[in-house]
Regions:
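Intrinsically disordered, low-complexity terminal regions
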Residues: 1-158, 162-177, 181-242
């Protein structure tokens, strides 16, 4: 990526992150009182998708039992929402949080097919998430860091967000745009398809096949020695072997 492209991307992402940051003490939203308490919440319906938003920190654990605990400032519990609708667990808030000592969600689940993080939220796995097909999405300054074991993983990252993956998969689909990053050098895949544009970066590790397309100041970096490689470099895009 050229110096001017990096500067423009950094400027745009800074503006996005400022608009999406919910834990900055700018006086907008509810301020936590600093008295942290942990409360268990019941989940009465089945779900196989999770959507996290509004700057919350979520820790995911695949388990035989389903459970959900909220660790947050005492006065924030009433505005943190956790509800299942049409098989989707939505974790969010009714109001913005301007400052908090803690705003953690600890979720244990059995099976999952889709995880989406948006609006400055952070998502982490505490163990390896096993699934046949898994769809992952980060946007609007959010971060996701997962260890996975899948047949197929389809991931997308946009608007200054970061997605970091480790583990193993048979096939990886990766799509990054608008200054976002997909960091999957520690995810061992057999077949990978990667598309990056608008100042985004993708790093991956593939053994058998690679299809890569980079345009508009984007970079795709790959580890491994795939036997079949198809590369398409657009305007100021780079595809680089590591």
């Amino acid at each position: 990526m050229t110096t001017i492209s990096k500067f423009i991307t950094a400027l745009i992402m800074s503006l996005l992150l400022v608009s999406c940051q919910f834990n900055s003490d700018f006086g907008f939203g509810v301020r936590g009182n600093g008295d942290v308490e942990t409360i268990e919440r019941s989940i009465d319906e089945n779900f196989n998708e999770i959507i996290i938003s509004r700057g919350l920190d979520v820790y995911l654990t695949q388990s035989d039992q389903v459970s959900l605990h909220v660790e947050a400032d005492e006065n924030l519990h009433d505005i943190i929402t956790t509800k299942v609708e049409n098989g989707i667990l939505r974790i969010s808030t009714d109001e913005n949080i301007s400052f908090s000592k803690s705003k953690k969600i600890m979720l244990s689940f059995k099976d999952i097919s889709k995880i989406k993080a948006t609006s400055g939220s952070d998502v982490y796995s505490t163990n390896t998430i096993v699934a046949d097909n898994l769809e992952l999405s980060t946007t609007s300054g959010s971060d996701m860091e997962l260890d996975i074991n899948t047949q197929v993983v389809d991931c997308s990252s946009t608007s200054g967000s970061d997605l970091r993956l480790s583990g193993i998969t048979n096939k990886l689909y990766a799509n990054a745009t608008s200054g976002s990053d997909i960091k999957a050098e520690n995810l061992k895949s057999k077949i990978s398809e990667a598309r990056a544009t608008s100042g985004a970066d993708i790093t991956l590790n593939t053994s058998d096949e690679l299809y890569a397309k980079a345009t508009s100041g984007a970079d795709i970096k790959y580890y491994g020695n795939p036997e079949k490689i198809t590369k398409k470099d657009g305007v100021s895009g780079n595809i680089i072997k590591q």
